[in-house]
Amino acid sequence: EILRCLVGSEMCIRDSFIILLFERRIVMYKILKAEKLAEKIFLMDVEAPRVAKHCEPGQFVIVKMDDLGERIPLTICDYDREAGTITIVVQIVGASTEKMSHLKAGDAFEDFVGPLGCPSELISKDIEQLKKMNIVFIAGGLGTAPVYPQVKWMHEHGVDVDVIVGAKNKELIILEEEMKAVAGNLYITTDDGSYVRKGMGTDVLKDLVAEGKHYDLCVAIGPMIMMKFVCLLTKELGIPTIVSMNPIMVDGTGMCGACRLKVGDEIKFACVDGPEFDGHLVDFDQAMKRSAMYRTEEGRAMLKLQEGDTHHGGCGQCN
């Protein structure tokens, strides 16, 4: 529209630009469903047909509630291409997500950008090859949300996988029934022993291997510290491991540099190169240190001094 107007008057260019801005303002992403899954954890179905049409398991979106809102990266928990909906799971960790938790059906997001990141590498593999593999997924806490669409995709393609879900206590176990419906075997563990068994996801994996289970691949998603210890164990057991990294993100396109990671001898950006990486190559200690630095003004100043304009110096409160 604007290119056609370039041969016309300046007034035409201006009017076309105003129309585009107006159209952007009226396109809102309506929340069709909002429910509380657990303490400080909420699920929402959002009307976003374009994202639903193109997304794949493993990808994420960046949402913004209004003009003054933060840009918040959220993993896609599920999608329905026919209905044109995306399911997201939100955990309250700061002011923006606390505000988001009060949204209800009928409300809308101003921005809902995606799909971002690379799809899970598993969905690009030959189905018959996947059927011959023994795969285990380990989800820690909110990591159950991004694990679910991958396991669901595998189930829909005739691939049975084992799933280990861990949480601090029974009340923080989410999507249990949904996961039961798609997992070959589901193992649940809680830190305090309030549900099924006591222990970490790594304890369950150790026991399964000790019982004679053999795994060709492990996919671990959850807090960085959890993924670190899963990778330490799987390296010892000789199990190749994929992790989904969730560092601080701002633009989701690799421009801000906030999500940089050291993977082997290379610097990667989780938003464009990931979020999945070889867990045995990720420098978790550096990633956790960097994430912690973003949470203080002094830390952000240090990162700006070290990295110049290759990171978002004003970040740190996105979640």
Where are the predicted features?
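Short, Lys/Arg- and Gly-enriched loop/turn segments at beta-strand edges
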Residues: 69-76, 116-126, 271
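FNR/FR-type flavoprotein reductase catalytic core
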Residues: 98-250
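Local cysteine-cluster metal-coordination motifs and their immediate loop/turn environment
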Residues: 146, 224, 246-276, 310-319
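Short Fe-S-cluster ligation motifs
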Residues: 269-273, 277-319
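Ferredoxin-reductase
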Residues: 29-107
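A generic structural signal for residues embedded in beta-strands
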Residues: 63, 111-112, 261
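Short, surface-exposed secondary-structure boundary micro-motifs
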Residues: 66, 114-115, 264
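Single conserved hydrophobic/aromatic residue that forms the stacking wall/gate
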Residues: 1-15
